[in-house]
């Protein structure tokens, strides 16, 4: 999935057990008090409809569908994120019927061609629109059509986040004993003075990773 993430992402949330992650969040005392742990608008949508989606499958989510990323982009607003999900056998049809089931009937869905790839725009009941990029192997969803276009560009040009040496060097793959991992782009820090010649071009700035664990009292 990281081969889909545009290189300008400022942070990425990764999990390979999204259903368990939702259970962990629902088990927090703050969730039981109706104080939802905010991650993103897309994550809030996922949390709202996940149980219904799981209910539509006889054996729960597939191993592939449990793999999920959310990338965050500038400017930092609730709508500037992309959710990515792997798809296994039969998942394409499941997700397609699920989206159609819950999208608004007020406006018809629209289809756009972008560099030979199809972007679908689904109207939602709250008046917003979801841009979706489907393939048999994955889907990418965003409230911003331009971000889905960037996903397509990253995939076709092979210039994704995983193609950046600074990220690829840091990335070690998902650990099995954590609910999720957050990757954050650190701001660059200039070293030396402008008059120091080559030293002034030295920059400190890369990626950091933080593993997330949950108990009823806290996220750490």
PLM-predicted stretches and their roles:
Residues 113-114, 132-135, 214:
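Generic beta-strand structural signal
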Residues 1-121, 168-197, 203:
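Structural boundary/hinge residues at secondary-structure and domain interfaces
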Residues 125-194:
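A conserved glycine-rich beta-strand in the N-terminal activation segment of trypsin-fold
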